[in-house]
Amino acid sequence: MRQIFRLSVAALLTFAVGVQAQVITYPEGLATGMPHNDDYTVRVRVPGREWKDLFEYNVQVDMDKVQDASMVQFDMGSPVEVMVKKNNETVREVAIRPLNNKVAYKQIQNTIFFTLDKPQYLSVEFNGDRLHNLHLFANPLETEKYVQEEKGVIYFGPGVHRPKDLPNNQIRIPSNTTVYLAPGAVVQAKLLVDKAENVRIIGRGILNHPIRGIEITDSKHVLVDGITVVNPDHYTVFGGGSSDITIRNLKSFSCKGWSDGIDM
């Protein structure tokens, strides 16, 4: 009996290590029609395992003179190794911001390697170029996922979603609803939470070029967590007359006036 117990404990420990030592990438991003940026080649892996390719999204920044930057993201549940290769120029200088994170790297020609021991959001810059940088989002693992629409859940799966015949290209979210943007989902609409409560907007998907990203008015108990908003026309999150609003792990890119703001 004692031997069986020890074997069971060992099996449980092995399972726990397997669950924790993981990195989740989003290959669905290759099929969304979102533009790709060839400036970088980025891969990630759990130490000792095979490298996984990431999709390098093209995102636009800077209002005075619009510039093309790059963005990648993945989820991590244990330390990971990252490889970043600069494809179109010789690397003379490297900065990984925020500098306070003190991310150490090793450089081999035009490629750098570094290890992340926890989720964090970084800007990788070569040769002092802050406008054509790589935005690297190492997200925490999702604690809640959906694979289809169900009661109380609006589900956007991998692919491009263009809601038709909706006033102002917006999707109204009712009370007691979870909106889940799956990895690889690209939604081209504004999410409107008006006179509603107990609403959650979660996932790893993208709101792409909406009029506004998320609008929250006269509502309460609203959570926004994990999604990315790319170049809204006006505000990333806009709201008023609301209470108990929580925003976590939100990523936003913009190249228009007022489009990067969170105005509550």
Language model feature labels by segment:
Residues F114-L116, H161-T178, V186-I202, N208-L223, ...:
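Extracellular beta-strand-rich solenoid/capping regions of secreted or surface-exposed proteins
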